[in-house]
Amino acid sequence: MSLEVYGQVNEALMYWDDGKESNVYQVTNDNSRTRIGFRGKAKIDADWEAGYRIEIGVRSANSKRSNQFNAKGDGNPADIGLDLRDSYWFVKNKKFGSVSLGMQASATDQITEINQTQTKDFAKYSDVEDTGFGLLLRSAINGRLTNNAVTPTTSATSSPGDNGLTLRRLIGDGGDQPGEGERRFNLIKYESPEIAGFTASASWGEDDFWDLALRYTGEFGGFKVAAGVGYGKVTDGYYLQTKTVCAGRADAAPGVASTDQKCDQFGGSISVVHEATGLFLNAGAGVKNDDYLKKQARFATVAGVDDSQDFWAVQAGIEKKFNEFGKTTIYGEYYDYEGGANSRRTVTQSDALSPDPGAAHGWAIWGTGVEVFGAGIAQGFDKAAMVLYLSYRHVESDLTLKGLTGATSGPASGAIRNAPVEDVDLVMTGAIIKF
């Protein structure tokens, strides 16, 4: 059995401006974070082989969890340091495909972010959460941060505003785009052999989910094309086991919260590169539906509840070897997300985001929206297996709230009000080196 050691280091400086305050943090770029891995395989006979993969992620600081009070992003200590990304074995047959078992990527992992260019390592066009979306929301009315967080905490395990709304909470509550699968599942997965550029895969994992995906790679007419579509369903279980966030949970009994979930999602993406000119286009989209949201006590008696989420994103530019060092990438991008209600979060009547600070009730999240406009440049250095990059993103957010009958509980039967949020500007510059 062979052994190959591989990995990468991806560290950056991240500048942010939330409309009132700005700063620069040194972070691990979570678009493709620092990691080290071990993999190997061995032939059993002419048609069969077996192998394994173990991969460990490394974060010195977390680019998607840092906030105005916490440069490292370690409000949850598990968000920095080491984490297990892969630990599985596989058996593969040339004619019938492969089966793998253990902690690994699901069939739909990265299905909405297929990308043949250098931007996949530092500015994923559809997974915008990874660049600065741990920042707390700042009210555009009073200039204060959500959760009234104004001074550092003395706690070793939390920072002020940990219970407040961050940018990522506006994207399906967890920050992952609708339609996208995940890594770090305990699952069994089947992958078919390639037929005319197409491969199919399916996975099932605890507790419980399953998904299906179809991918294509090929070249024709001077274009390199990579594309994929996938469908996934969470049928039961606690979200910390499945890693998929459904915004609603089932009620075991009226007024009693349960950890059960049930949602399904569909997504896909395509990446096209014109080999002669280097012009490229990456595009992705996805939708998620939450079957339990309308069964929540908060929304069960309320008309007009939206239990869906959707997004689309596009990135286009040119990637070509203009100099002897390696490829240069210049691009622009746009991302748009629209989401419905959320039963996991509330805004208190005294919060900075409250539309009516004098109200006797809190607020339910009725709808969210995120728009991102971005651009960037990167330079590859082939001899060093390194890419230097600079990316910029301007983030505009929408937050709509609906009054609760109680401060933090009861049906959302009150008025619908907007909660204006300050725009955010984000700049990331750094390098990734692979080995």
Describe the function of each predicted region.
Residues 3-11, 46, 50-54, 97-99, ...:
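Transmembrane beta-strands of outer-membrane beta-barrel proteins
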Residues 16-20, 61-65, 110-113, 236-240, ...:
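Outer-membrane beta-barrel proteins
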Residues 32-36, 85-89, 184-188, 198, ...:
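Hydrophobic, lipid-facing positions within transmembrane beta-strands of outer-membrane proteins
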Residues 421-435:
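Outer-membrane beta-barrel "beta-signal"
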